[in-house]
């Protein structure tokens, strides 16, 4: 276990008081679950979370100061019960060391040292953290993500009775009645044999309403084509009245608004960090893609339903937001030449498939997304923002969160050059240029 943890966190962590702790000692303490808490001292929501998380952490660890809770009392010094085998590590985005020190001083858990800025950034990219505060739980032995939305764990299971909060099958989480907007109720068993889109959305969210209008047409086309397909609306509306108003526009099913526990479990299952989000599932309930929103917007005629992920994407307005999710390889081409974009996709697809398969075998997300960018206003804006030359073809890796770019300046781009470029990036052998 210590090997994985040291690779992830480095050799040393620090306590709130500034004392160093050897990472390999976590294994000796029987830690089975690791929480990574991403936050910042300047964020009011992070300050609020720290207070509630401290009480939660204390209860699970059996600390008397946390008040009565499972495991507290005389047996607290004994071999830890499974629910107590938890450690949390704070991963900060602070830019001021004094503010960081003031913030971590009262934390009862550990923190990544302030100086480990590069490692912090790698963790943010690895787990696709898009907002703060965020709390994810990992199996401390295998490194697999157990739960992507630990904030809901704290809210829904404050005593830690469901520890270690591992993912449950979709069929189990969705079990119960589902509604149509005419008041008809169906059992979730009616979904058997169907592809399912789990749609997290809300009426108060303008991008949600825009997507819903497109999704209604996509749903109609797919059903008319004879496909077994259903969508389940999981509302984030702020009132039942708003839910009913929004749901009246939808021809599909919904989790009842009053079933807050089931809505929360679905958010937890898929680690929802923002809306709108459309998760596409196969008939067995396994995730096909988390990027259903992008796929629907890019495939107006639904010819590629159920939208299995492509190893290489063509950069567009609808998927450009993915550039902010982590490092992305972008091959810029002259799209005025017919077939140039397709040839570029074929050029980088073998290495993209190899990288994706390697990390899928480890049940991890690939550390890179792969794009081909043609010539349009959006691509021009991207070149301007990243200060890239107008050359084409141009092979780059862009890391927006690190404000860094890597450019391969060669006359001819070959599969071997692409693979070497990617491997050198993953091995941290490339020198970044600032964006």
UniProtKB/Swiss-Prot annotation:
<dbReference type="GO" id="GO:0016055">
    <property type="term" value="P:Wnt signaling pathway"/>
</dbReference>
<dbReference type="InterPro" id="IPR036249">
    <property type="entry name" value="Thioredoxin-like_sf"/>
</dbReference>
<keyword id="KW-0007">Acetylation</keyword>
<keyword id="KW-0225">Disease variant</keyword>
<keyword id="KW-0560">Oxidoreductase</keyword>
<keyword id="KW-0520">NAD</keyword>
<dbReference type="Pfam" id="PF13905">
    <property type="entry name" value="Thioredoxin_8"/>
</dbReference>
<dbReference type="InterPro" id="IPR045870">
    <property type="entry name" value="TryX_NRX_thioredoxin_dom"/>
</dbReference>
<comment type="similarity">
    <text>Belongs to the nucleoredoxin family.</text>
</comment>
<protein>
    <recommendedName>
        <fullName>Nucleoredoxin</fullName>
        <ecNumber>1.8.1.8</ecNumber>
    </recommendedName>
</protein>
<keyword id="KW-0963">Cytoplasm</keyword>
<dbReference type="InterPro" id="IPR013766">
    <property type="entry name" value="Thioredoxin_domain"/>
</dbReference>
<dbReference type="GO" id="GO:0004791">
    <property type="term" value="F:thioredoxin-disulfide reductase (NADPH) activity"/>
</dbReference>
<comment type="function">
    <text>Functions as a redox-dependent negative regulator of the Wnt signaling pathway, possibly by preventing ubiquitination of DVL3 by the BCR(KLHL12) complex. May also function as a transcriptional regulator act as a regulator of protein phosphatase 2A (PP2A).</text>
</comment>
<keyword id="KW-0879">Wnt signaling pathway</keyword>
<dbReference type="Pfam" id="PF13848">
    <property type="entry name" value="Thioredoxin_6"/>
</dbReference>
<keyword id="KW-0539">Nucleus</keyword>
<keyword id="KW-0242">Dwarfism</keyword>
<dbReference type="GO" id="GO:0030154">
    <property type="term" value="P:cell differentiation"/>
</dbReference>
<feature type="domain" description="Thioredoxin">
    <location>
        <begin position="167"/>
        <end position="321"/>
    </location>
</feature>
<keyword id="KW-0217">Developmental protein</keyword>
<dbReference type="InterPro" id="IPR041861">
    <property type="entry name" value="NRX_PDI_b"/>
</dbReference>
<keyword id="KW-0221">Differentiation</keyword>
<dbReference type="GO" id="GO:0005634">
    <property type="term" value="C:nucleus"/>
</dbReference>
<dbReference type="GO" id="GO:0031397">
    <property type="term" value="P:negative regulation of protein ubiquitination"/>
</dbReference>
<dbReference type="InterPro" id="IPR012336">
    <property type="entry name" value="Thioredoxin-like_fold"/>
</dbReference>
<dbReference type="GO" id="GO:0072359">
    <property type="term" value="P:circulatory system development"/>
</dbReference>
<comment type="subunit">
    <text>Associates with the phosphatase 2A holoenzyme. Interacts with PPP2CA; the interaction is direct. Interacts with DVL1 (via PDZ domain); the interaction is direct and regulated by oxidative stress.</text>
</comment>
<dbReference type="GO" id="GO:0005829">
    <property type="term" value="C:cytosol"/>
</dbReference>
<feature type="modified residue" description="N-acetylserine">
    <location>
        <position position="2"/>
    </location>
</feature>
<dbReference type="GO" id="GO:0030178">
    <property type="term" value="P:negative regulation of Wnt signaling pathway"/>
</dbReference>
<dbReference type="GO" id="GO:0001701">
    <property type="term" value="P:in utero embryonic development"/>
</dbReference>
